[in-house]
Amino acid sequence: MWRPSDNKLYVPPPAPVSKVITTDAYVTRTKIFYHASSSRLLAVGNPYFPIRKGNKTIVPKVSGFQFRVFKIVLPDPNKFALPDTSIFDSTSQRLVWACIGLEVGRGQPLGVGISGHPLLNKFDDVENSASYAVNPGQDNRVNVAMDYKQTQLCLVGCAPPLGEHWGKGTQCSGVSVQDGDCPPLELVTSVIQDGDMVDTGFGAMDFAQLQSNKSDVPLDICTATCKYPDYLQMAADPYGDRLFFSLRKEQMFARHFFNRAGTVGEQIPEDLLVKGTTSRATVSSTIYFNTPSGSLVSSEAQLFNKPYWLHKAQGHNNGICWGNTLFVTVVDTTRSTNMTVCASTTSSPSATYTASEYKQYMRHVEEFDLQFIFQLCSIKLTAEVMAYIHTMNPTVLEEWNFGLSPPPNGTLEDTYRYVQSQAITCQKPTPDKEKQDPYAGLSFWEVNLKEKFSSELDQYPLGRKFLLQTGVQTTSFARAGTKRAASTSSSTPTTRKRVKRK
């Protein structure tokens, strides 16, 4: 007996699904290159917490374990004074920048920064136990310092990077919740902002919500949120704007092993152990943790102070800086030295040392230098390209002074002749639509390069490296006092006089 197949039949969609295409399909690259570099970028602050006076922050928090997110502002190439105007037709084309090379310079010596907590929740040493501690006292917190996980990181894109961390979730309405129950966890994806803390070895999580005792981790993160770049989410971005390419190097080992004081919320199942007697009748705390360490820092394993060239991005955006904006995210914990500053409390210190006569301070400094090579590109404004760009990012067309005609309205609108007349109802003026900042409310380190572009590549270190790598011949468009001899059409070859050697 014949039976139809039990397999499901998948019907294709009635309309074709729009396909994301690479920028190389509609962006034409020219042979014009520019070098741009920032000034020396410096930051100084307290490595553990900001210092506040009233409602004002007088010393910011500056740590070697923070994300540095640079928002690079580029000039509008459509308003640029180009050396060759024949490459661009303003009626049918628009110009964009493509980032093809960069170098992140890092100053300051290599060093290991430490952090700690004067009241860390450490109960017992479970690595080399001399005794079996069972009943912790009311407060067993101790002063512990440690070095963190070692991280070097560089993310480049034309949109802010995304980070992930674990936060406090929402419990279902039908579940009974009591004080002291473990809260549900939720994976949160958010934009990485300048000053956010990186994963230090204790996990990417919201410590303010998930550790209410403020004693389980060091001071600089006990009320902060440590984020880890969401590489999976950024790699899945259909347009590839958030991550052109990334560099990372991470290393860590566990230095010491401790356990926590406090009531264990989830007891060990009875089938996992045999009950003890006397001093082992009560099981000690099984909430174990380790202190991380990033180990040796060396100049042989540095990701910075060297050039990187972008030939093919990992996504569909091959380095095009939409909105004339570029984001460079940097983490470098190999230069996390915390400097101790000492100041005397008296104008004439005593001859013998007295500790109370001196005040001690902690400071951390950061030093950066950003260099870029940009390539000028053009886009032909066809109907298909404009429709695709509008679907991808409508603000791009708005910045190019393009707009879409609204669909026809079926209703009849009223327009009065005398708008200011008191005989008619009040006509409220229509306010001008202000341009909305897509990154309003987010904190970035803004670097303005609108006046830092130069076509003289051979005058800059990164430009000379680019010329050496690519063999591109630069042409000086405004070099005074340089003349070229006129070419001749003579067919007579130039002969050299042979010198007779003895």
From Swiss-Prot:
Record-linked Gene3D superfamilies: Major capsid L1 (late) superfamily, Papillomavirus
Cellular component aspect of the GO annotation: host cell nucleus; T=7 icosahedral viral capsid
Main location, first listed in the record: virion
Molecular function (Gene Ontology), one example: structural molecule activity
Keywords: Capsid protein, Disulfide bond, Host nucleus, Host-virus interaction, Late protein, T=7 icosahedral capsid protein, Viral attachment to host cell, Viral penetration into host cytoplasm, Virion, Virus endocytosis by host, Virus entry into host cell
Entry keyword Cytoplasm: no
Subcellular location field: Virion; Host nucleus
Gene Ontology biological process terms, A to Z: endocytosis involved in viral entry into host cell; virion attachment to host cell
Location of the region described as Disordered in the Swiss-Prot/TrEMBL record: 478-502
Compositional bias segments (type: Low complexity): 478-494
Oligomeric form and interacting partners: Self-assembles into homopentamers. The capsid has an icosahedral symmetry and consists of 72 capsomers, with each capsomer being a pentamer of L1. Interacts with the minor capsid protein L2; this interaction is necessary for viral genome encapsidation. Interacts with protein E2; this interaction enhances E2-dependent replication and transcription activation.
Similarity comment: Belongs to the papillomaviridae L1 protein family.
Biological role: Forms an icosahedral capsid with a T=7 symmetry and a 50 nm diameter. The capsid is composed of 72 pentamers linked to each other by disulfide bonds and associated with L2 proteins. Binds to heparan sulfate proteoglycans on cell surface of basal layer keratinocytes to provide initial virion attachment. This binding mediates a conformational change in the virus capsid that facilitates efficient infection. The virion enters the host cell via endocytosis. During virus trafficking, L1 protein dissociates from the viral DNA and the genomic DNA is released to the host nucleus.
Protein name: Major capsid protein L1
Native organism: Pygmy chimpanzee papillomavirus type 1
